[in-house]
């Protein structure tokens, strides 16, 4: 008969993953609500206790304990066992450590522990209370993985470990984050709930007001703590404990003595130092980790003029000096993961301890009754000692003597066994008194145990007494300070920025940088670092307190505070926008750059190839939340082939639009409505089907130039294009040819005075002695031509101008720009 079964892969995967999920939920990642332990932690404690590796004895090699645990109870690899053992020994992760370790057991800096062959470990004293009375049949046991011996499914837990040490873990579909608490406060809450089973959460929080982290710190948000205790979920703010320390010379330093729970100290120090290195906050001189055996200490030395409180607020907001701790109190309750609140945790623990105390009392009572039975037999023997001795002497052997005792004097099997094994020295008068005292003590003990078993009030008194004993022995002061309200950190970012002079440069391909005046002045403009196929389109002197706006050909705008730009040498290429802006496209280019002091006022005009135009307000470009990683739209393009042709600040002048086919239209800028960033604008010029916009510019002079793709150039009077309304076709400025027709490559105003500087992106740079406006043309063969536009004579409107060289017509224009 075949053992092969036909099953669908879908059914098999679902069923097997269901098994796996159930296993890791119940047997790996989540703690039991009763003892607060995960299976691996429970197995470590039980195995070490079973092997006698306890508090009152010497340390043993960790590797030996790990081997015993792995071989007997936890066959999942030595590293997982050792990691769990190490964590239970780390006093910065546990409020009460359960394992004491000799040797390197890691650090708050995230250093790994020494290998287990080098370290030694034993159970801590308080861990013994978790295992107390386990030998008295108080908890259920189950077979281990190979059915060779049994292990406990839960520990007796003489204190509420789940709340005291907390827990964290990730399972299939579940995760848990339960913070540690102060032992004394937890026990006080348990004792109160024993006396008041229906106690309100508000009353319980008078005894247990909130978590108590082993690393101290300040916990803010009483309402969130209450919410977490009520629902099992919540979030509190955990802030480092800091103080401002005065130094010589009027300087100050910020001292950190406590940091938030589970924050890596070395990483924190590195992040704070990165703030100094990147000059995100001016005024930090040095960051030092001065921690030693006496405790944690981080020193942040400040400059003399620095605002210590502002710097501290910045560090609290942007580093792990302050973090959010998220409560997610999930535990295994009756084999099921549940999100539990404080009342449920306490009631489950009380119920568990009730079972433990009753089972322990039953065990002790049975043992006492058995001993009382023996003692009663021995006392009776002493009253008829001579007869008993004679009977034993006349017996053939031990078995015969036992049988004779049972038949002749009605002793039980247990009493007969005790009599025949009785040592002769026990037959003295002193021993008779001892036996009588023992009988009285046993009867009192049995009465007490019976009361515990039969009377709930007596049992609860025992529970409270034992909890108070634990509290008395292990009580320690609260480490974390609780504050009712979460303080909102407000930072005047502008006040943090040191005002420095710098030079900002931008290339068409999207490379940008800022350069110190020293580096800039040590080089010439032509020595700027850039790729061979790229073009420098913007250089300007600016202050680090100002802002840079970059407008692209795809209708996107990118914002950068000047102080956030990478400070590089003038000869360095710079940082490409694609390194930080996730939606910067490969074919995207920078069209226009602008440095602004504020966003309060100012208008821009944008014109697209499809002939649409719009004005928009600078206020709408105020920094958005994701500016560091994403650009935002300033104009909506009509299709994928559409591009922005012109972007410039708005002035109260006419606008002149020139199409590739040679149509020019002039109208007032006031005809263009101010619209939102996501609009496409209105029709600026009426285009034929095969036409598109080549250039658009503000009319600020009496003439303008037109350059064609064949290298023909002309200058004509602005008055030849009379002002009309937008959305018209315009007038031709080229003469149409049947063969090799001219098409507009670039058009722009011809400036004859310094008023042109606001449109010249290079005007803030020291120039040559002449202020003439030059047109630079590069042909497709790499030839460069320069023409002084002001020297051109005016041409008629319908003419094609003159070629700038005899060969340019065959080469055609690749790049053209004015300067």
UniProtKB/Swiss-Prot annotation:
A cellular component annotation (GO) from this entry: DNA topoisomerase type II (double strand cut, ATP-hydrolyzing) complex
Active site, renumbered: 118
CDD domains noted in UniProt: TOP4c (cd00187)
GO terms, biological process: chromosome segregation; DNA topological change
Function: Topoisomerase IV is essential for chromosome segregation. It relaxes supercoiled DNA. Performs the decatenation events required during the replication of a circular DNA molecule.
Record family assignment: Belongs to the type II topoisomerase GyrA/ParC subunit family. ParC type 2 subfamily.
Name under which the protein is recorded: DNA topoisomerase 4 subunit A
Native organism: Streptococcus pyogenes serotype M1
Gene designation per UniProt: parC
